[in-house]
């Protein structure tokens, strides 16, 4: 018996130590640069802590003051490449910096031939290196790049930097077009980033969408692969995605892509001037969604040359997406002519609705009612969002949790109309400066169980809001968080996509990112 007790005690001690060791491994913090190298998807608390706090995309860095190895004061102007410049913050004592320099050094001639110059900026840390040590390290490894020194760390601190290596991709004028904290892991990753720098963020994503989601008839499939489940799913097409692609095409002036997307909508989704909310093969949904039709209407108006289509679709929306008292409603049924008895707040795209006002007598009264309904949906300044929908029959607002993609669309429409509440903007700014935005909250502003994750789409919409209100810092924060989900790998079929794998790709993320990128190009940020 005593022997058995000793065996049991020994086993208990063994498993206790094993559990303690596992706990230590789980809780052990990873080195900064090692965490920086992980990509593309991360938890909210990890996703941006290493991104420079004060950087603004489009910001000119050329005038910042540095020191040459000879002790002379300089700015970046003498070091800019003909077309593009990679400014990499590094330190000779930093192992991850050394790996990145070793990746770039053999590519020096290739980069130079492409008009790309590499400049090393030494984060001089007297406790870890000296000027002589830095010179010796570069000489010993025969590093062919120019280098300068942020000797008092003034620029490092001004930009709110956190780690090295951090690489700034500058255009020919010295403006930041892309920032990548952490190690560039491969030539394929660098190639994708250089393509981004040369052609803009949209190019790689549009290429991915064309290759993997855009079918032969111009429909944007929900996913890359067929699902085999109930419709809609897999390679079915949502009116939502068609409208977003048309929005992107209108913003970029791409008439051929616009025509292709619209032709699909007219052929496979159109039901008497309204769009079925999805198409699955030769079948389509039996109801429309007001927001989908408004998005297409707005894109037709923005593209120009579709006057008759704008008028006919505006009249159809006014006729079918209002009840007998003139209230705007979510959907109209093609099968039995019935209508929804509610209005979802994110369906109130005021810019699109204003297109209808002068075309349909009395439509202004419907807008006034909808504005009153939306104002009543406001949850308060502590959590400055809006209830999901209003039920006309019960005269009550939904008290369910908020899908933040839909909640953000409501704020976007408010911002586009010039009615975004200061409390809403302040909430966005605080969250984006902090741990980010989760996928789902209750009406009190608490994250709901299962909703503690982020999505590229939500951050894309935050970026669109930032564009509307002219907040460059918020825009940069939104883009950088969105791009933490983006694949940068020129040799990967996933390059340019916002997903971890082809199985995880959804059209909503890709299309919203394209719309955001299009707006950034038009603002020349």
Roles of regions detected by a PLM:
Residues 98-140, 153-157:
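Structural microenvironment flanking redox-active thiols in thiol-disulfide oxidoreductases
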Residues 135-173:
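Short, internal strand/loop/helix patches
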Residues 9, 39-77:
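N-terminal "domain-start" segment that seeds a small globular fold
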């Amino acid at each position: 018996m005593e022997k058995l007790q000793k065996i049991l005690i020994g086993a208990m001690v063994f498993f206790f130590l094993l559990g303690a060791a596992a706990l230590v491994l789980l809780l052990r913090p990873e080195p900064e640069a090692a965490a920086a190298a992980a990509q593309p998807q991360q938890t909210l608390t990890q996703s941006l802590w290493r991104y420079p706090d004060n950087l603004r995309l489009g910001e000119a860095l050329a005038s910042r003051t540095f020191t040459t190895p000879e002790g002379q004061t300089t700015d970046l102007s003498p070091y800019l490449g003909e077309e593009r410049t990679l400014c990499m913050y590094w330190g000779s004592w930093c192992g991850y910096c050394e790996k990145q320099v070793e990746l770039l050094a053999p590519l020096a001639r290739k980069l130079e031939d492409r008009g790309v110059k590499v400049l090393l900026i030494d984060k001089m840390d007297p406790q870890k290196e000296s000027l002589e040590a830095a010179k010796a390290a570069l000489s010993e490894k025969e590093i062919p790049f120019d280098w300068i020194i942020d000797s008092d760390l003034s620029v490092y601190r001004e930009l709110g930097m956190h780690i090295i290596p951090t690489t700034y991709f500058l255009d020919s004028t010295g403006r930041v077009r892309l920032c990548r904290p952490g190690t560039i892991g491969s030539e394929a990753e660098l190639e994708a980033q250089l393509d981004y720098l040369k052609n803009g963020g949209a190019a790689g994503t549009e290429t991915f969408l064309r290759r993997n989601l855009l079918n032969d008839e111009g429909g944007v499939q929900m996913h890359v692969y067929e699902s085999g489940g109930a419709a809609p799913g897999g390679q079915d097409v949502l009116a939502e995605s068609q409208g977003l692609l048309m929005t992107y095409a209108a913003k970029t002036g791409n008439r051929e892509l616009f025509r292709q997307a619209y032709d699909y909508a007219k052929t496979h989704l159109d039901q008497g001037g309204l769009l079925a909310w999805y198409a699955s093969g030769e079948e389509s949904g039996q109801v429309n969604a007001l927001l989908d039709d408004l998005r297409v209407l707005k894109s037709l108006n923005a593209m120009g040359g579709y006057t008759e289509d704008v008028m006919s679709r505006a009249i159809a929306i006014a006729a079918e997406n209002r009840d007998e008292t003139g209230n705007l409603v979510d959907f109209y049924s093609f099968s039995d002519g019935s209508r929804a008895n509610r209005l979802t707040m994110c369906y109130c795209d005021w810019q699109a609705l204003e297109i209808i006002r002068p075309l349909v007598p009395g439509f202004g009264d419907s807008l006034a009612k909808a504005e009153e309904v939306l104002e009543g949906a406001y949850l308060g300044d502590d959590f400055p969002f809006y209830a999901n929908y209003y039920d006309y029959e019960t005269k009550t607002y939904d008290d369910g949790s908020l899908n933040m993609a839909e909640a953000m669309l409501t704020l976007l429409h408010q911002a586009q109309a010039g009615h975004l509440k200061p409390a809403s903007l302040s909430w966005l700014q605080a969250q984006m400066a902090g741990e980010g935005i989760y996928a789902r909250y209750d009406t009190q502003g608490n994250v709901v169980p299962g909703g503690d994750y982020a999505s590229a789409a939500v951050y894309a919409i935050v970026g669109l809001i930032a564009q509307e209100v002219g907040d460059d810092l918020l825009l940069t924060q939104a883009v950088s968080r969105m791009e933490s989900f983006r694949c940068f790998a020129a040799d990967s079929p996933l390059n340019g996509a916002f997903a971890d794998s082809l199985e995880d790709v959804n059209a909503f993320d890709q299309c919203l990112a394209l719309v955001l990128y299009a707006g950034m190009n038009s603002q020349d940020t």
